[in-house]
C-alpha cells in the first residue's frame, strides 16, 4: 500500500509537514535559541511601587544634597576616560548616578530629568530643584498613604506653587550695578570672589546682552579675553562635520565663509567655493538657507576622507529677518551674500567674494564667529542703521526686539573666560563653578534677585501661602505639604554647615517672618540681612527650580503602577571546552 503512493501524494505529505527554520540561520544572525524568547516585564503596584521610586529618589538626592550651600562638599566621580572628576555641580552629580534596582533607578532618572530641565532653562539651581523634588514627593507619598486623593493633592500643590511664585515676583529686586552682578556670581561660584569679579568684568565689557563663553585655559591663571564677534542660534547641519568629538563641536581657524540666501542642493553650486578652499588650504564654512542632497553628500565625503575641512550651517531667523541677519554676517566677515534678487549666482563665486574670520565655533545649537574681516566703519554704519530703525515710532515692539538682538550681536562682541589650573581635575572643577556663576548672573540680570540661602522660599512658606485659605482638611494637607517641602533647601544648607537645621529654620519663620531679607549666613553662622551681605539668588533660578520640581514630584505621587524590563534570565551552562567528549575513542584506534 505504501509502495503504491504516487510521487504527487508523497510531495503533498512532505509539504504538509511543519517546517523548521535551520539552526544555522539563527547562528548566522548571532542569536541563540535562548535569546529568541520574548522579554517580559516586572510590575509593582500602589504603596510598593511608590516606595521603590522614593528609595531611588532618596539615594540620588542624598548624593546631590551634599553639594548645597557655602559649606557643601565636593563629589568625586569616576570617568570612563581620563582623570576622575571632582565637582559641586548638582546636575553633573545627578547624571552620574545609575542604580542597580530598576524600580529605584526609575525614580532616580525622573529626578535627573528635573535637574536637567532646570539647568536648561535657568542654568543653575539644579541642586535646589533636586532637594525640592525629593521633599515634595516624600510629602505626597505620606499624604496618599494617609488617604488623600492623589489627583486632588497634585492640583492643590500646583495652586500653592502659583501663590508662592506670585509672592516671590512681588518681592524681587532688580540689579543694576557691577557690584550686585559680582555678588550674584560670587554666591553661585561657592563664595569665590575672584570668579565673581571675573564675570562682572566680562559683563561690563560686552554689556548685559553680550556673549560670554567659558573655555579651558593653558596656564594656571584665569584669563579674560574680549574679542569682536557674533553668535547666532543655529548649529551644524550634520554631526559628520564635528572636529572635536569629545566636546561635540566644530572649530576652525581662519575659515572662508560662503553666504547664500537660497537652499543649496546641486554640487555645481559649491564647486567654486570648494576649489577656492582647497587652493588656499583654508577651512570652508557654508551658511545658507539649507544644504541638502548631493551638495551635502559631497561636503561630508570630503570631510570624512580628510581632503577638506568643511562645515555647513543654516541661516537663523525667518523671512525678512533672515535676510537682515545674513547681511549682518556678510558685513562682519566681508563676504558677498549670494542672492537671486541681485543676480548673484553661487556657481560663479570667486575667492574674493568669500568672507573670512579669525575663528569659528559651531555646536549642535549655535555658532560663534570671532574676529571677522569686515571693516570697522562698515560695522559701525550697519549699527547706526539698525539704531535708526529702532528709533522709528512706526517700528513694532516685536521688530524692535529682533533689532536689539542684531545690534547686540554686531556691537557687543564676545568675552572668553579662560579657566586656568594646575591640573585637568582642578580646571574641570573650577570651570563647572564658573559656568554656574555665569548662568546665575544672566538669570539675575533678566528677572531680578531674591535673598539667598533658601531664605526667599522660607518667607514665602510663612507669608506667601497665607493668602491661600483652606476650605477642607484635604486642602490644608496640600498647603502643609508644600510648606514643609519648600523649607527643605534652607534646612539642607544649614545642616551641610554642621548646624541644626530645624532650630535655625524655626527661628527664621517664627521671629523673623516679617523681615523678607532676614536670613542665616551659614558660612559665618550669623543672622544677617541677606541682600546687604551679598547673599542672593536669582528669581529665575528659584522659580524654575520650584516649578520643575513640583510638577514632576506631584505627578509622581499620582503613580499607581511602575513597569520595568525584567532582568535577563541566565541560559544553561555550555559544554566544557576542549575535546573531552571524545575520550572513549582511545581504545579502538590502535
Swiss-Prot record:
Transit peptide segment: 1-43
Single GO term (MF): integrin binding
CDD domains named among the record's database cross-references: GroEL
Cellular component terms (Gene Ontology): cytoplasm; fungal-type cell wall; mitochondrion
Any one GO BP annotation for this protein: adhesion of symbiont to host cell
PANTHER family in alphabetical order: 60 KDA HEAT SHOCK PROTEIN, MITOCHONDRIAL
Record family assignment: Belongs to the chaperonin (HSP60) family.
Name of the protein this chain belongs to: Heat shock protein 60, mitochondrial
Species this chain originates from: Ajellomyces capsulatus
Lineage of the species this protein comes from: Eukaryota, Fungi, Dikarya, Ascomycota, Pezizomycotina
